[in-house]
Curated annotation (Swiss-Prot):
Family as reported in the entry's similarity comment: Belongs to the aconitase/IPM isomerase family. LeuC type 1 subfamily.
Cofactor binding comment, as recorded: Binds 1 [4Fe-4S] cluster per subunit.
GO molecular function: 3-isopropylmalate dehydratase activity; 4 iron, 4 sulfur cluster binding; metal ion binding
Pathway, per record: Amino-acid biosynthesis; L-leucine biosynthesis; L-leucine from 3-methyl-2-oxobutanoate: step 2/4
GO biological process: L-leucine biosynthetic process
Function: Catalyzes the isomerization between 2-isopropylmalate and 3-isopropylmalate, via the formation of 2-isopropylmaleate.
CDD domains: IPMI
Keyword set, alphabetical order: 4Fe-4S, Amino-acid biosynthesis, Branched-chain amino acid biosynthesis, Iron, Iron-sulfur, Leucine biosynthesis, Lyase, Metal-binding
Full protein name: 3-isopropylmalate dehydratase large subunit
Length: 466
């Protein structure tokens, strides 16, 4: 019987089936400071120990400051942020969980650190108390976000009851246009299928365009699968996947490596495997994208115009557009390139890897950011990425252009740490969400690729790469 990649991974981890749900074994769990305190507290109250300490890896990321790290935790000004990181440290020590602490050079965003360390491996089932866990599917893994109570359940038992998703194949074919990246592909797809297009499905991205992407690019794509409504996003294993994993600290070696690679080569959908839903896109139709509203599906090309609600396809969409225009303080039918921006954020679990930073540096080299830009940040996804960028001299390009070069963390992706927008500020961001107040109360977020963020920083308004 032919199987999709998702079917293969689910079947490989099923312990028991019960009507419409399946009890599956969880190979790895990533933990951060926001969704874990109650889970550890539940273990303590019940007097339980973790099923497998080695199956878990913790790293603080949401609340960590991206400046003034020399004082450690005591340097965190916000008492709640400080408490959450202190609590993670304490819980990991109490329960024997391996943690990469705040000032360790390996620290970073959990969805960057997992693959970087080799903790994320093809064929594994991977969970985290974070919706963007779908990122890890780029390595041919079964990865999805879970809630706090489920974090506790995985800690205690190493298992989870899950309802099986339907299969959705999104195929992208052809050569990408110049300056078009995985982020543009993701936003373009979401613009076409909507934020509910993948609801109830596991999305497998396929086609020669996807195969041409680096692993970093595939991570960006799978990271955004959740924004299309899917819980799971994945790409089949190929030689790029195996080359990426090889030699990483926690990856297998020797005879175990050879055995693993043999299995990993089977992690692709079989020919003629059944998908409940299929969508095809041509790469030549994809241009650099930018969101204009309060949902990732509210997206246009960088040379496009703000949509007019009068042209909405139905009443629901019309009202949604009107509300978005009102919140974003935008006027229909104006060219988006005429809109000025206040701040620029390059980072997040979507676009903070070394490939992203190299692209940004190539656009910024020998240029300065516009005078109207109040703040421009480049925040690497991990301390190791920061180290590599500095080795290549990218940090000097960022700083010379007027950007601030920060420490690793989630930073301005969400208003949970010191890096946030003020009321009325408009930000062009390489992150993944643009709902009301995401980057700060009363702020306006526009999602773009790293290249477009850098180009727009130079001109002070939404711009293509020149």
């Amino acid at each position: 019987m032919t199987q999709t990649l998702y079917d293969k991974l689910m079947n490989a981890h099923v312990i028991r089936r019960d009507n419409s749900t399946e009890l599956i074994y969880i190979d790895r769990q990533l933990i951060h400071e926001v969704t874990s305190p109650q889970a550890f507290e539940g273990l303590a109250i019940a007097g339980r120990k973790p099923w497998s300490t080695s199956a878990n890896l913790a790293v603080p990321d949401h609340n960590v400051p991206t400046t003034n790290r020399s004082s450690g935790i005591n340097g965190i000004s916000d008492p709640i942020s400080k408490l959450q990181i202190e609590t993670l440290d304490k819980n990991c020590k109490t329960f024997g969980i391996n943690e990469i602490p705040m000032n360790d050079i390996r620290q970073g965003i959990v969805h960057v650190v997992g693959p970087e360390q080799g903790f994320t491996l093809p064929g594994m089932s991977i969970v985290c108390g974070d919706s963007h866990t779908s990122t890890h599917g780029a390595l041919g893994a079964l990865a999805f976000g879970i809630g706090t109570s489920e974090v506790e359940h995985v800690l205690a038992t190493g298992c989870l009851w899950q309802s099986k998703s339907k299969n959705f194949n999104i195929e992208v074919s052809g050569k990408l246009n110049k300056h078009v990246s995985a982020k543009d592909i993701a936003l373009y797809i979401i613009g076409k299928i909507g934020t509910a297009g993948g609801t109830g499905h596991a999305i497998e991205f396929s086609g020669d365009t996807i195969q041409s992407l680096s692993i970093e690019g595939r991570m960006t794509l799978c990271n955004m699968a959740i924004e299309a409504g899917a819980r799971v996003g994945m790409v089949a294993v190929d030689d790029k996947t195996i080359d990426y994993v090889k030699g990483r600290i926690l990856a297998p070696s020797g005879a175990k490596w050879s055995k693993a690679v043999e299995y990993w080569h089977t992690l692709h959908s079989d020919k003629n495997a059944h998908f409940e839903k299929i969508a095809h896109f041509n790469a030549k139709d994809i241009k650099p994208q930018v969101t204009w509203g309060t949902s990732p599906e509210m997206v246009i090309t960088i040379d496009g115009y703000i949509p007019n609600p009068a042209n909405a396809k139905n009443h629901t969409e019309k009202v949604s557009w009107e509300n978005a225009l009102n919140y974003m303080q935008l006027t229909a039918d104006i060219k988006i390139s005429d809109i000025k921006i206040d701040k620029v954020f390059i980072g997040s679990c979507t676009n903070s890897r070394i490939e992203d930073l190299r692209i940004v540096a190539s656009v910024l080299k020998d240029k300065k950011i516009a005078n109207n830009i109040k703040l421009a940040l480049v925040v690497p996804g991990s301390g190791l990425i920061k180290k590599q960028a500095e080795k290549e001299g990218l940090d000097k390009i960022f700083i010379n252009s007027g950007f601030e070069w920060r420490e690793a963390g989630c930073s301005m992706c969400l208003a949970m740490n010191a890096d946030k927008l003020k009321v009325g500020e408009r930000c062009i961001s390489t992150s993944n969400r643009n709902f009301e107040g995401r980057q700060g109360q009363g702020s306006f977020t526009h999602l773009v690729s790293p290249a477009i963020a850098a180009a727009s920083a130079i001109t002070g308004h939404f711009s293509e790469v020149k």
